[in-house]
Amino acid sequence: MERLNSKLYLQNCYIIKENERLRKKAQILNQENQQLLFELKQKLSKTKNSSGSNQGNNNNNNNLSSSSSASG
């Protein structure tokens, strides 16, 4: 019985250490993920802002061409 307890204790210690290792790894991955998400949002925001003015002009041009072809 004592031998079984010792074996289970050692397994438990191993599991606890492995759990700590995985928790640290998950924390690092989460930080990397948050950083990548932040960078992606910045890039999307920049491209949206820079293409937003061009897209507005394109929409106006499309509306004009649609209007002229519909009335023509």
UniProtKB/Swiss-Prot annotation:
Residues 49-72 have a biased composition (Low complexity). Competitive inhibitor of the HD-ZIPIII transcription factors in shoot apical meristem (SAM) development. Acts by forming non-functional heterodimers. Part of a negative feedback loop. Essential for proper functioning of stem cells in the SAM. Signal peptide: none annotated. This is Protein LITTLE ZIPPER 4. Residues 14-44 form a coiled coil. Disruption phenotype: Zpr3 and zpr4 double mutants exhibit homeotic transformation and ectopic meristem activity. Interacts with REV. Residues 42-72 are annotated as: Disordered. Induction: Up-regulated in response to increased HD-ZIPIII activity. Up-regulated by REV. InterPro entries: ZPR. Keywords: Coiled coil, Transcription, Transcription regulation.
